[in-house]
Structure formats: C-alpha cells, structure tokens
Design a protein with these regions (language model features):
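Active-site region of glycoside hydrolase catalytic domains
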Residues: 44, 48, 84-87, 93, ...
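Active-site glycine- and acidic-residue-rich loops that bind
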Residues: 61-69, 105-108, 134-136, 146-149
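Chitinase-like catalytic core of GlcNAc-active glycosidases
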Residues: 1-104
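Gly/Pro-rich active-site loop or hairpin
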Residues: 94-115, 172, 177-192
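Glycan-binding loop/region signatures in secreted carbohydrate-active enzymes
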Residues: 130-194
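Long, low-complexity, intrinsically disordered polar/charged segments
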Residues: 5-32, 120-125, 144, 148-149, ...
C-alpha cells in the first residue's frame, strides 16, 4: 500500500491532476473493511496535499447483495471514507449478456434509491453510459459476444440498413434491429439525447 500511495501522490503532482478516482472491482467480501480503511487512509494523505479522492462503486441494491462484484463494496464505509462516489450505473446490457439497455432507468433508480440510504446524497454521482452494443442473434449464453459501439456508430448502422430506431419507454433507451450482409439479424442498444 505504501508504494501505491507514494506513486499516486507523485503522479497527481507531476501531471497536475486535481484528485483520484479509485476503481477496484471484484474484491471479496472479507476485504470490504480493509478496502474502506485503505480509502480512508488515502483520503487523509491526498486531502492534506489538496487532492480529492473518489471511489467507483458497483451498482448495489442492498447491503447484503451477493456476488463478487458487490461484496467488497460496503457503500456506507466507502461513502464515509472518500470525498465522493461514482456509482457504476451501467453494464446491465454488456458484451457477454443478452441484448438489453446498457443503463435501464428502473435499474439505475433502484441503485440510487439504495445508495442514498448509505451515502450522503451530496457525495453521489452517477456513471453514465455513452456507448452501446451490437448483438448478433440469436443470443446464446456463453457463446454470443456483442462488440461495443459508439452512439454515433449505432445511428450510422441504422441509417446504413434503413431501419427505424425504436425507443423502449421502460428502459428509457433506443434500440433497433438490422440484418447484416451475411443474413445475421442484429439487435443494437445504445444511448441518445432522450
């Protein structure tokens, strides 16, 4: 830890950064307290030099949420240890998962509803997706892989294939289907200004 802290401080000063956002993922639950203690130590050191410390948190919906992505992030402890948190409210639709919105609004709201019970609201910021995925169909779990695409590329694909962009009112996300030159049907979810 000491070497990491020293290197972080040197990098912040050398590059002229204002602070640091720590994004440690897949921490086992038994390390949750140690992780929060590390963040508290790092914050004290960084704040004393005029830097801020933030931490990115997996999108939890309860304190006891199971899973390696969630168990190492104690929202209350991390929220107390840092200057601010960035909730990773994206990746419900992802490369290896079934076609769906990257950041469905009901999921984002559920995470935020829980977060404000554990972390002061003024410390909470939402991570927003600015990309999409292009799934070849049919989706087969463990086999299908959807490449990520920019929102602009998604719009270009819809134009190239002369298909209408639809809008899922529940997820609050645009999507469309198109048929590739090889006959494969694709489903694309992305984000736009709506």
């Amino acid at each position: 830890q000491d070497r990491l802290v020293d290197q972080v401080q040197q990098t912040l000063r050398r590059r002229g950064y204002a602070g640091l956002d720590v994004d440690f993922e897949f921490l086992p639950g038994q390390l949750a307290a140690a992780y929060a203690a590390f963040l508290a130590r790092l914050r004290r050191l960084l704040n004393s030099q005029g830097f801020f410390l933030w931490a990115a948190l997996a999108p939890k919906t309860s304190a006891r949420q199971a899973g390696l992505l969630y168990e190492g992030h104690d929202y209350a402890a991390v929220g107390a240890a840092v200057d601010g948190v960035l909730l990773m409210t994206y990746e419900w639709g992802y490369t290896a998962g079934p076609p769906m919105a990257v950041s469905p609004l009901p999921n984002v709201r559920t995470v935020l509803d829980y977060a404000v019970t554990e972390i002061p609201p003024e410390k909470i910021f939402l991570g927003l997706s600015n990309y999409g995925y292009d799934w070849p169909l049919p989706f087969v779990q463990g086999v299908t892989r959807a490449p990520s695409i920019s929102n602009q590329r998604a719009i270009e694909l819809a134009i190239e294939h002369d298909v209408a962009i639809q809008y899922d009112e529940t997820a609050q996300a645009p999507f469309f289907h198109y048929t590739a030159a090889d006959g494969t049907i694709h489903e694309v979810w992305f984000e736009d200004a709506r």
